[in-house]
């Protein structure tokens, strides 16, 4: 039987493992096909594909897009995406910028309650992921 996992996240979004670490884990578990579906992010796909090709794992390039439908948060999985598309990259940058601005506003509101969260610490914790500085880090 061919083992696969089509819904995974790397440290480029809310996963804890880099693309290489995730692929090593997949290899240890006998997974031959791995879908990289980071939240609103595609930055780890190329890195994953390059490393996976060396260890015999097929990467399905994907994404998990966040959206709202009738005031309900939904996540939409997309597979076999064009991760090199400049239009997609521009859209994802726009989404990241909106999240970061919202996070800054929340930090400012928390100061009114004497809750001071240094932005440099939040940015360090957020790392390089697509989620960027977001609610998850506050």
Name what the model sees in each region.
Residues 99-125:
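Conserved phosphoryl-transfer catalytic core
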Residues 22-33, 97-109:
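Alpha-helical scaffold segments that flank or form the walls of functional sites
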Residues 125-133:
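Cysteine-centric redox/oxidoreductase cores and disulfide-bonded domains
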